[in-house]
Amino acid sequence: MARGNRRNGSRRGSGTTGSSGSSRGRNNKNRGRGGSSSTSRRAANGGKRAGAGKFNAPELMDLDFGAIDDVNMGTGSMRSLSKRPGRNTMMQEAFLTSKHTDRFVGEPLRKRPIEFIKAKEVYDPRAILEKVINKDEANDADEATDITVSLRETTIAEQNEDNVNLDHDENEKENEKEDVEDQKPVEKDEESKDNLEGLREAIENDEKVKSAKIDDETLEQPTIEMEDSDNEDDSQSDSEGFFIDTSAQPTNSPPAYVPPNDIGPNIDYDPVLTIGNVQLHTSGAGNDITASVRSSTHHDELDSLDEFSDSESDEDAYADYIRQLNEQDSSEELSSSDSENESASTDANVSSTNSPQIVEYGFLSEDYEFDVSQISVTNVRFGIKNQFYSRCLELTGSVDDYMWVDEDDLIDFVTSKGVKEHRLESFLSYITNGMINKTENDEEEEQEVYVSSDSESDREIYGGTAPEIEEDDDGIADLVAFSKSSTKFRDTIDTSAVGTTGKGSRKQLDLERFAQYELDDDIIDSLQQQYKIRRESKKSKKQQHQDELMEEGLNKYNLLLKYPYTLHIKDIKDEFESFLHNPARDDLSFPPLDPHGNKTLTKMAKCYNCKSATQGKGIRRYIRVSKYKRTFKYLPDYGHINAILRQRPVFNRVDQKRPKEEYIATDGNATKDRIRQRNKSGHNAYIPEGHIVGGMAPEIDHTNVGRQLLEKLGWVKGEGLGAHGNKGISEPLVATVKKSKTGLGQTRY
C-alpha cells in the first residue's frame, strides 16, 4: 500500500516532488520535440545559436571564435539579397540564355533571314579623312603664321634697338667732326658730290631689288652679334677716312671704299628652324615671306645721310652698307651650296637603299631543268594549308582534270623534278601567273572596265528604256556591263575524267576513248605505270598516317587509336595493370562497347578498387575508370579477375565497323557462301499458284495390283466405288495450289 502511495504520489506530484515531476515531464515533452540539451545551451548563450550571428552572414564566420558580432552592416545578408524574389536565379538565367543561343545557332540559315536596311547617311570614310586632314593643315598653317609674325616682330624690335645705338654713336662722331671742322674747315668738291649722288642712287636701286627677296638668315641671326664686327669696321673706316689736314689748302677726297670682309660672322647655320612642334625651312627654296626686314634700317640710314652729307661720315656709312650687302650675298651662296649638297646626299642614299629585285623565273639557266608545261594552275586557295587548283598527270593522275593539291606536295614534287629551293618563290609566282604576289596596276584595270558616260549608252544596255539612276545607285550600270563583258572569261570547259577498269590489283586506266588519237604503246604503258605508282604512293601515305596515329595513341594512352575495332579480355587486363602501376595517370577511358562489354569493364574496375562511370550517349557510350583512396590501400582481387578472364574473350567496338578483310578472316565470307549454296546441283521444285496437284499424272496401268483387285470386286472405269445403290462420286476431288493470303472466293483460275 505504501508502495502504491509512493507510486501515486510520484505520479500526481504532491508538494516539491510533484512539481519536480511535472517539470521533468515538460522537459521530456520538449525532448521529444527537439531535445532540451540544445535549448538549455542556447539559453545559456543568450538565445543565440553557435555560428549564427545577428546578420546571418556565413561569409563572416570565424571557425575558431564563432560569429563576428561587432560588424556594422545592414539587416539583409548577401544570401538573402541574392534570392531576388519573383525572378529567376542567375544560374537559371544563364542556362536559359545558353538554351536560346543553342537553339538559335542550331536553326538552318533559311530560318534566319538577313535583312538589309538602307542607311540614312552615306558613310564615306575617304571624305571624312579628307575633312580631318584639311582641318589639321589649316591649324598648322595658322600656327606657323603666328610663329612667323611673332618672330618677325621680335627681329624688328631688336633691329630698332641696334639702330638707336647706332644713331647714338653717329651723333657722338658728328659732334667730334663738328669740333674738328670748327677748327679747320674743309671745302667740298663738286666732283665728290656727283659721285656721292650716283652711289646713293645705285644703293637705292640695289635696296629695292634686295627687298623683294626673302632673307630667312636675318630672322635667325641676331643683330647683337653683328655689332662687334660693325664697330670694328667703323673704327677701321674712321682710321682710314678721318684725318686732320694741317695745311690750309683744300683737298679733294674721293669716297673711301672698304674691301669686303671674307671672314663671315661666327654664326651657326641650321637649314631647319624648330619652334615647338613647328619646323621652318630657312633655305631659299622654302621661303614664303615677301617683305624684307632690313629695309627700314636702310631707309633710316638714307634719311640720315641727308642731314650729315656735309661731313665725311657719309662716305663711311656708304662703305659700311656695301660691305653688309656683300656679306649677305656670300652667306646666301653658302646656304644654297649646302642645300645642294644635302639634296645630292639624300639622292645618293635613296639610290643606295634600293633593294635588289628577284629575277623572274625562266631567265636563269637552272630554271630549264624542269618542264614547266607539265603543271597548270588556275586558282589558289589560302588557309592553314595553301592549295593550288592544278592539273598535272603525275600529281592528279589525269591530263584534263583539275584538282586541289597542297602546297607541300607541290613543292616536294617540283623539287624532286629539278627546281631549286632558292627559286621556289619565283617559280610559284610564275605558275600562278602573279596570283600570289600580284602587283596592282590601276591603269590597266581602268582600261578593262567599261564606263558609260552618257544616257544614250545606258539606253542601249537596257534595250532603249533606261531606268532613272539615283545618286546612290551610281555605277551599278557599269558593274552590270562589266559582268556581261567578262562572262566569257568565266565559262568553264566541259571535261571528263579518265575512267578506270578492273578491281583491286588489276585496276588500271581506261584509255579506249583515246583510241582516235592513235597513242603509241610506249605512251600507254607510261600512263599505266604512272597511275600504278600514284596508287602505291597513296596507299603508302595512308599506311604511314595510320602508323603515326597508332604511335600517337600509344604515347598518349589513347585506347581509341590503339584498339580501332576489337578488344580482347587480356588486353583489358593489361590496360588495368598499366593504369594501376602508373602514378602519373588518374583516369582511363575505354572505347565504346556493347552493354555486356561495359558491364565487364565495370566488374574489372571494381576488382582493381577503382571507380567506374558511364559517359556519352547512344553507340558512343563508354566507361571511364578513375583512381580514388581505396585504390592505394587495397590490392586487386586477382581471384575474381581470373574468373572474368575465363568468360567472354572478345569485345567488338560498337562505334566502328570492322574492315572486310578482318571479318572475312574470322567469320568467313558470307557472300561467297550464299553463291555456293545457290550454285549447288538440283533445284527446289517450284509450283505456281492455281496448279492442280496430280493433274498431269498418267493413268494407273492394268498391270497394277490395286486396279486388278478393284476390277475383281466389280469396279468399272468411269464409275464410283461402292455397292449398288451406295456408290461414291465418279469424278475425283481436285487439289489446287494456294500461296496468296486472300480467301478461297477471291481466287480465280
Swiss-Prot record:
All residue ranges annotated as the R3H domain in the record: 566-629
Sorted UniProt keywords: Cytoplasm, mRNA processing, mRNA splicing, Nucleus
Sequence ranges of Low complexity compositional bias: 11-25, 36-56, 327-338
Domain G-patch, chain residue ranges per copy: 702-749
Main location: cytoplasm
Source domain of life: Eukaryota
Signal peptide span: none
UniProt biased composition (Basic residues): 1-10
A biological process term (GO) from this entry: RNA splicing
Subcellular location: Cytoplasm; Nucleus
Name of the featured protein: Protein SQS1
